[in-house]
Amino acid sequence: MTETIATIKEKLASLADPHDARLLTWRQDKRCGVQKAIALWEKRLALARKKQADFNQRFNFERDYWLKGVELVAGVDEVGRGPLAGPVVAAAVILPHDFNIVDVIDSKQVAQHKREQLYEIILDQAVSIGIGSVDAKTIDEINIYEAARQAMTEAINNLAPQPQALLIDAMQVYLDITQQSLIKGDARSNSIGAASIVAKVIRDKMMTDYDKVYPGYDFAQNAGYGTKKHLAGIDKLGVTPIHRRSFQPVHDAIVNKKNC
């Protein structure tokens, strides 16, 4: 009995072996729907292989250390340099050597719902995770660059066990630990990518909580960035304790209020 096209599509959906004997039979099936289904399956397989290869390549920096006997390598990243409000948050993540969640990459390349799923997986599988944050008042006092460094340092210090080497996204920290600063590291290292996801999800949750404390600025949606609704909130309600007064739009709002 000839298989229906729907049945073949269903079987292809769960097929991962390109040498499966059924493929030979299906490729000889002259029905257009079957050939389209096989072409789509081949495309999906090629994309999955590329995704796996890219993921494997993003472990190159970690693997260099592992091969030298350096087992505990932490990826470090921060989020929240650009917003007008809220803290800068950093995460440090040590991944196990057999970690194989290929979707882990720079948090900016991952949709929110997917980030939250990956966050839970990383929490479950990581050897260790450390978090650090620096509030708006301190950002104003020491500048955002130094605040990011301070948050990263705090995150690293909160790791247990402590790392033997660090892979850091575009930063050096003042710690006596072997470290590499990688430009766009969150897209080049799985450990840094994992750290960026953890930091992003945690900071977004913090800003959602702040939205309840300080309504009218749309913090739950803009995460403190200078959107139209956020700027309108500043114009109407003034600045909050979590606003960064050294950042231009906020500083201007304070000056304008004093001059009125």
Curated annotation (Swiss-Prot):
GO biological process, one term: mismatch repair
Cofactor binding note of this UniProt entry: Manganese or magnesium. Binds 1 divalent metal ion per monomer in the absence of substrate. May bind a second metal ion after substrate binding.
Cofactor: Mn(2+); Mg(2+)
CDD domains, per database record: RNase_HII_bacteria_HII_like (cd07182)
Location in the cell: Cytoplasm
InterPro entries: RNase_HII, RNase_HII/HIII, RNase_HII/HIII_dom, RNaseH-like_sf, RNaseH_sf
Residue ranges of every copy of the RNase H type-2 domain listed in the record: 71-259
PANTHER family, sorted: RIBONUCLEASE H2 SUBUNIT A, RIBONUCLEASE HII
Family indicated by similarity: Belongs to the RNase HII family.
Protein name stated in the entry: Ribonuclease HII
Gene name tied to this protein: rnhB
